[in-house]
Amino acid sequence: MTQSENVAAAGGAKTEPKVRPAKALQGVKGMNDMLPADAPLWEHFENAARAMLRAYGYQQIRTPIVEHTQLFVRGIGEVTDIVEKEMYSFTDSLNGEQLTLRPEGTAAAVRATIEHNLLYDGPKRLWYTGPMFRHERPQRGRYRQFHQLGAEALGFAGPDVDAEIILMCQRLWDDLGLVGVRLELNSLGQAHERAAHREQLIKYLEGFQDILDDDSKRRLYTNPLRVLDTKNPALQEMAANAPKLIDFLGEESLAHFEGVQRLLKANNIPFKINPRLVRGLDYYNLTVFEWITDKLGAQGTIAGGGRYDPLIAQMGGKPAPACGWAMGIERIIELIREEGVVPDAAGCDVYLVHQGEAAAQQAMIAAERLRDAGLDVVLHASPDGKGGSFKSQMKRADTSGAAYAVIIGDDEVAAGVVQVKELRQREQAEGGGQQATVPAEGLVDYLIDAMVGASE
């Protein structure tokens, strides 16, 4: 006899199997959600950035998140950390192509410039923003999915544009109210100058093989410049005394670097020359720079860039000079929080309270008319679909951040009026601002006049 038959024979009811709740799924480690509470701060940064980029005449470009892997191998450099161990790459099961989630934005912007012949009528100033992906250990300020803002000045050779892209960053820091962000500067010269320096640098580093860490040993003969960028405390003295690339620069490279410095000084931009600053990508030449803060711990670089004149030709385009920068948006958002310059979250203009079937219909009509006039309106809706009391709705209106509550009940519908209550006049007596009865047809004009008056 089965268990259910035993239960039935005993006169008991059949027991339904206990259903376990499904386990909640979570996001991928290092790939974070941006929640509604964070949105105003992101929008604040994005609005400031867009305004700055417009002020300098930059145009937006958007490229795919997925590119051919070879784009980054050729563009970033085969022996860089990004290409060797940080890229999310996969084989397309449909056609066998090797594809990669973009780890940075410059290579794709240059690819698009070449593919669409954007330089046919002269130099271009372009900017981009979006998510990038690197397979690394997540920590504060370093994520597997992160967001970049970048600017690329393509077709410009002079030190004036190097200086201008640095000034752009300073203007953004000023607009965001950020202080204590310092600029470090260096020149990587040209390829033949780096080759002469590389030869001497390898000879120097070979004398320290007994203390080099694994990363430095791996880079010794493939990318020795990156050894100078080591964060290992035991190697700092060695790196500080290494041959300096700036001592190998010829007249033209030195003149370019001095031109950049002269323009920065003329615009009152303080900077420090850091001969060990090399950046982590192989496409740079001449000017390189980083903006650094001490308020974010080890991940203190919030923006960096420089000149990359060889890259366009290296990727198959007609040779053209170029320079640019990229900044990590998450790190800047964190710095804004650290410095306490977070803007107040903006509420909507109107919260529409209603009770009764006829009132609900009129409230929706009124909300659409207000939106037609350019106002931001939240129309009350309750979780249970029953509306809720006027008291509970007014609490929602107050916590929404709205400047005004518009109140409609069936009595107001019958009389052809609405009630308008000020919610943000804190100098008024406790309980909020004034309340007025307004003809329904005149609601839009009344609120616009009231809001204009409040802003004067």
From Swiss-Prot:
Keywords: Aminoacyl-tRNA synthetase, ATP-binding, Cytoplasm, Ligase, Nucleotide-binding, Protein biosynthesis. Pfam families: HGTP_anticodon, tRNA-synt_His. Homodimer. One of its GO terms (biological process) is histidyl-tRNA aminoacylation. It comes from the Bacteria. Its EC number is 6.1.1.21. GO terms for molecular function: ATP binding; histidine-tRNA ligase activity. Belongs to the class-II aminoacyl-tRNA synthetase family. It is found in: Cytoplasm. Its main location: cytoplasm. The lineage of its organism: Bacteria, Pseudomonadati, Pseudomonadota, Betaproteobacteria, Burkholderiales. The keyword Chaperone does not apply. One of its GO terms (cellular component) is cytoplasm. It catalyses: tRNA(His) + L-histidine + ATP = L-histidyl-tRNA(His) + AMP + diphosphate + H(+). SUPFAM superfamilies: Class II aaRS ABD-related, Class II aaRS and biotin synthetases. InterPro entries: aa-tRNA-synth_II, aa-tRNA-synth_II/BPL/LPL, Anticodon-bd, Anticodon-bd_dom_sf, His-tRNA-ligase, HisRS-like_core, HisRS/HisZ, HisRS_anticodon. This is Histidine--tRNA ligase. The gene is hisS. Residues 1-20 are annotated as: Disordered. It is an enzyme of class 6 (ligase).
